[in-house]
Amino acid sequence: APKITSSGAGSKLMQNPELCGRMVAAARGALGPDKPLTVKMRIGWDAEQLTGVAVARQCEANGADLIAVHGRTREQMYIPPIDVDAITEIRKAVGIPVLANGDITTAEGAKQILEQTGCAGVMIGRGALGDPWLFERINAVLTGQPEPGEPSLNARMSALRAQIYEMCEEKGEWTAMPQARGQAMHYMKGLKGAASLRRYCSMLEHFTDVDKLIEAVYKLQG
């Protein structure tokens, strides 16, 4: 986000591999030798500054135990497909485990990127929004088990309600509900009347509104 990079933080650090190394060293010094230290990074700042390998090596040399690589530059944000070759290059450049990240929304997609990059695993972010069952499907495919089917409508609504309830318990309703609006929208994907349901999501103010939303979902699905 611009407000992050404008302060020199976040993916802006991809422009300064040495600083990344010093930060990892400081974190390692604070944590001590026994606690795991992980790093999340992109492949570079832009097409002219593909510093992923240099950053990864600095992180490894200064005590990182694992690196997760999002396969785009900061300039690309989330628009083009991830650069599998760039992730692979970073994975080959270090001796610690590397996780592939970006555009992983299906179990087969996770399996494919692992085969393409040779990474030790995957990191899931946006792909799991509204679909917490993605991890179960990935685990099944990677272990040679039958892939579970799509969750029922009851399961989806129960998960939505439970997630927002836990958010309210942790953060308080005043803080949690504005954040819950976006989370709820992801659960509307593929449902009849999804557009109107997303508008309903955008107006959630209290936890009791979630039950009203779920009632509207069932009514529209018939």
State where each predicted segment sits:
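Short beta-strand segments at enzyme active-site cores
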Residues: 34-42, 66-71, 100
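Active-site beta-loop-alpha junctions enriched in small/polar residues
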Residues: 40-46, 72-74, 103-105, 127
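Active-site core of PLP-dependent enzymes with the aminotransferase class I/II
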Residues: 48-49, 79-81
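Active-site entrance/lid segments in N-terminal catalytic domains of soluble metabolic enzymes
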Residues: 1-60
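Catalytic beta/alpha-barrel core
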Residues: 15-16, 68-72, 77, 100-102
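Flexible, glycine- and charge-enriched loops at secondary-structure boundaries
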Residues: 13-17, 80, 153
